[in-house]
């Protein structure tokens, strides 16, 4: 029943995690039969996963998955009388803070932007992204009304998302 309280992109992300990472393992087991040892086994499988290039899931992605299953059990405790959340006894997985981001130096950016000097639309877009630090979705949601050339300001108050093939602008 949380769908109405979430932005479409957030809801789609949560649904994906539930459908791909939680339901295949726990979907047919009653919640009150899931034990902390089951959660630990599942966590260990996720932390051991490697893709075809040998890369594991990032620590922040693991934390996001773990937060989702913890929230499901918290909801069951609060609204459906589940005695306790097995995730609390199992412990956490992953880490909250993302890896430190790497940024281009001005020289690196100048090398990159030279390729777009004859493409004004892309040149303006990449210059704006680099010098403001806005995200791609925020950039794609901008309208002419958001830009005040006299005050040299850009109002960033919405985000572009593609959710299940549907293009959305969210605030």
Tell what function each PLM region has.
Residues 98, 164-171:
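C-terminal catalytic core of Y-nucleophile DNA break-rejoin enzymes
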Residues 157-158:
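Radical SAM [4Fe-4S] cluster-binding motif and immediate context
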Residues 55-59, 63, 78, 82-142, ...:
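Basic, Lys/Arg- and aromatic-enriched nucleic-acid-binding interface segment
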Residues 2-83, 98:
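N-terminal core-binding DNA-recognition domain of tyrosine site-specific recombinases/integrases
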Residues 17, 45-48, 68, 114-118, ...:
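Residues within well-ordered alpha-helical secondary structure of globular protein domains
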Residues 152-154:
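Hydrophobic residues embedded in beta-strands of well-ordered beta-sheets
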Residues 31, 87-90, 168-171:
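Short clusters of hydrophobic/aromatic residues that line enzyme substrate/ligand-binding pockets
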